[in-house]
């Protein structure tokens, strides 16, 4: 679950981290009023969306008069911002963050992720702030410095100082950086984060460190113990189908093809999509109904797939282990009957109660194409689409 920049900065401020003073605005009038509250003669207006690359797409603007701030808000509020990290529709802008401009002397990068290979939180810092860290890692990896957090001892001040020295910081900037590091590490652990990025972490001409930008991603599997963060989740930034699927514990990701896929198990789902592509078709989605699929969830999965107008056929591939194939068959029959399916449906059932499940589908009288293997199913679905 992603947070907006302004939400991340509110969490930062509560923990004593240095952030620019700013106001979240929902109208052009509020944006102009924010300049009066902030004072000064230079402000930064930022569209709040769950995507990077805002600046290159016109979603961030440096303004030298209140009218420019107001015009920027008028231009973007209620519109969609398209960046290299969004799809072609972009993401809706409902908030504008207006901040006093910062007098920047140097830009740094500071971030943290969970390193799967070591099962530890790893902090990364670089002098190459303000640019995409992926490009730095590709072209100049020696400029990225890392420290690993031991889960038993937690973050240590010496680790913050170590990073500061590697960045070439001196004097009071070392202690400032170390304190920021410690507070961020505690935030990462307390809020069950999966990703934290400050890009850039700037040094002002007065030698003060400020978190100029903020990006936080919360581990979705830990939201049950983060009720406060769950409440501020902005579902408008997600694909509507994906958000709806999450309510039914379905793992759904929209894609660009026209073959709807419903599978149990993430690995099998990816393998199914590969087979669909191998035989000349394109998957419209990734959808994992999970090991505890019920008739109701299967019915809902069909509805979600069919809400995509691009879908011309549906492939159901179920390997029954925990899940029973006959229950999946009940869900398929109920969904086809309820929705009034007008497109081809290819079903492959294997494993737990596969034969009773196949018999239910056969006896239903519905136009469902049976497949006896994944290869057969992929060929059938590709042929069905070509015939339409």
Swiss-Prot record:
Chain sites annotated for binding substrate: 264, 321-323
The record lists Mg(2+) as bound by 199, 213
Pathway(s) the chain acts in: Carbohydrate metabolism; tricarboxylic acid cycle; succinate from succinyl-CoA (ligase route): step 1/1
Name recorded for this polypeptide? Succinate--CoA ligase [ADP-forming] subunit beta
What are the names of the required cofactors? Answer: Mg(2+)
> Pfam families in the record, alphabetically?
ATP-grasp_2, Ligase_CoA
Q: Output the superkingdom of the source species.
A: Bacteria
| Reaction catalysed by this enzyme | succinate + ATP + CoA = succinyl-CoA + ADP + phosphate; GTP + succinate + CoA = succinyl-CoA + GDP + phosphate
Q: What one GO molecular function would you report for this record?
A: magnesium ion binding
Matching entries from InterPro entries are given as: ATP-grasp, ATP-grasp_succ-CoA_synth-type, ATP_grasp_subdomain_1, Succ-CoA_synthase_bsu_CS, SUCC_ACL_C, Succ_CoA_ligase-like_bsu, Succinyl-CoA_synth-like
Q: Per its UniProt record, what PANTHER family does this chain match?
A: SUCCINATE--COA LIGASE [GDP-FORMING] SUBUNIT BETA, MITOCHONDRIAL (PTHR11815:SF10), SUCCINYL-COA SYNTHETASE BETA CHAIN (PTHR11815)
Q: Which organism is it from?
A: Hamiltonella defensa subsp. Acyrthosiphon pisum (strain 5AT)
Q: List the disulfide bonds.
A: none
Q: Which HAMAP family match?
A: Succ_CoA_beta
Specify which residues bind ATP according to the UniProt entry for this protein: 46, 53-55, 99, 102, 107
Gene Ontology cellular-component annotations: cytosol; succinate-CoA ligase complex
Q: Does the keyword Glycoprotein apply?
A: no
Listed A to Z, the keywords are: ATP-binding, Ligase, Magnesium, Metal-binding, Nucleotide-binding, Tricarboxylic acid cycle
**ATP-grasp domain residues:** 9-244
**How the cofactor binds, per note?**
Binds 1 Mg(2+) ion per subunit.
Similarity comment: family membership: Belongs to the succinate/malate CoA ligase beta subunit family.
Question: What processes does the entry annotate via GO biological process terms?
Answer: succinyl-CoA metabolic process; tricarboxylic acid cycle
The EC number(s) this enzyme carries: 6.2.1.5
Q: What does the UniProt function comment say about this protein?
A: Succinyl-CoA synthetase functions in the citric acid cycle (TCA), coupling the hydrolysis of succinyl-CoA to the synthesis of either ATP or GTP and thus represents the only step of substrate-level phosphorylation in the TCA. The beta subunit provides nucleotide specificity of the enzyme and binds the substrate succinate, while the binding sites for coenzyme A and phosphate are found in the alpha subunit.
The record describes its quaternary structure and partners as: Heterotetramer of two alpha and two beta subunits.
């Amino acid at each position: 679950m992603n947070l907006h920049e302004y939400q991340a900065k509110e969490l930062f401020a509560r923990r004593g981290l240095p952030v620019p003073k700013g106001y979240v605005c929902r109208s052009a009038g509020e944006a102009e009023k924010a300049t009066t509250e902030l004072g000064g003669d230079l402000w930064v207006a930022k569209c709040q969306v769950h995507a990077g690359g805002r600046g290159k797409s016109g979603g961030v603007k440096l303004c030298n008069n209140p009218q420019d701030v107001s015009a920027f808000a008028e231009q973007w509020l209620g519109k969609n911002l398209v960046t290299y990290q969004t799809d072609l529709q972009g993401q809706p802008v409902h908030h504008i963050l207006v901040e006093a401009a910062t007098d920047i002397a140097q830009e740094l990068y500071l971030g943290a992720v969970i390193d799967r290979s070591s099962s530890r939180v790893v902090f990364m810092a670089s002098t190459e702030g303000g640019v995409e860290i992926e490009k730095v890692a590709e072209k100049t990896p020696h400029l990225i410095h890392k420290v690993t957090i031991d889960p038993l001892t937690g973050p240590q001040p010496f680790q913050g100082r170590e990073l500061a020295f590697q960045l070439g910081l001196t004097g009071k900037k070392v202690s400032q950086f170390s304190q920021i590091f410690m507070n961020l590490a505690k935030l990462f652990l307390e809020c069950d984060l999966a990703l934290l990025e400050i890009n850039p972490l700037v040094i002002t001409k007065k030698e003060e460190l400020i978190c100029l930008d903020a990006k936080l991603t919360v581990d979705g599997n830990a939201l049950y113990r983060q009720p406060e963060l769950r409440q501020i989740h902005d579902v408008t930034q997600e694909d509507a189908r994906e958000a709806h699927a999450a309510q039914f514990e379905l793992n759904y990701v929209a894609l660009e093809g026209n073959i709807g896929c419903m599978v149990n198990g993430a690995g099998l789902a990816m393998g199914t999509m590969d087979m669909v592509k191998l035989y000349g078709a394109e998957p419209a989605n990734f959808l994992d109904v999970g090991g505890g699929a019920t008739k109701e969830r299967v019915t809902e999965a069909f509805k979600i797939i069919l809400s995509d107008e691009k879908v011309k056929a549906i492939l159901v591939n179920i390997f029954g282990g925990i899940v029973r194939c006959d229950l999946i068959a009940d869900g398929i029959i109920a969904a086809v009957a309820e929705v009034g399916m007008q497109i081809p449906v290819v079903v492959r059932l294997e494993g737990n109660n596969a034969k009773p499940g196949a018999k239910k589908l056969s006896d239903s009288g519905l136009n469902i194409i049976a497949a006896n293997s994944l290869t057969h199913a992929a060929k059938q679905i590709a042929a069905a689409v070509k015939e339409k």
